[in-house]
């Protein structure tokens, strides 16, 4: 279950590196190209993957990721197609941790246990349900434990100590630390006074904290690692490269390669 995350973070620590984790929506802009995009992210040096399953209801996403959802849905992508892509990625890359970032409606629509089981069968390691805070997560957590999937929780920068304690106790895999409150995306740059939150998470022995929201530049990755995060997630900036190169596949894949290499290089201490 969380073993791929445990192994990854242990190996990175030995090498004095942080994790760079790109996010994309599965099926954006279509099924065939989506596999190539995810394949490119891994072969360019991504340490783990955070992936979305397209759904029409995405509350915490900024416009860039909403548009990725729309592109994928308009191309006719189905949840079955998404699981096909996940299965192919897992077969090609047996060791990389794969996480899904979703909303509760999508999980409910498929039946919680059935959905988690499908994820496990496709090679998924973790699930983060963006609109389910830790204190409301029992039904998901129990099934995650039973099935063998890590349940990831979001630690907001304005979280109380008791919330951070709860997240530390209940989460597994890693902790998704928000660098700011609001919707995702590079439209608002990440602000970084997160050292205090990171210190608390360490004190409570939380799963490794990874900073996300508004991470689009190598120096933000460096700052995150310097502040004590185990890695950084970049969603909107990655998706923007897809959006800006829809009509030029080779340029898109080249730019994604360059972006991942540059962001990964920033995790080296």
Curated annotation (Swiss-Prot):
Belongs to the TrpA family. CDD domains: Tryptophan_synthase_alpha. Pathway: Amino-acid biosynthesis; L-tryptophan biosynthesis; L-tryptophan from chorismate: step 5/5. Pfam families: Trp_syntA (PF00290). The active site is at 50 (proton acceptor), 61 (proton acceptor). Tetramer of two alpha and two beta chains. PANTHER family: TRYPTOPHAN SYNTHASE ALPHA CHAIN, CHLOROPLASTIC, TRYPTOPHAN SYNTHASE, ALPHA CHAIN. This is Tryptophan synthase alpha chain. Keywords: Amino-acid biosynthesis, Aromatic amino acid biosynthesis, Lyase, Tryptophan biosynthesis. Its EC number is 4.2.1.20.
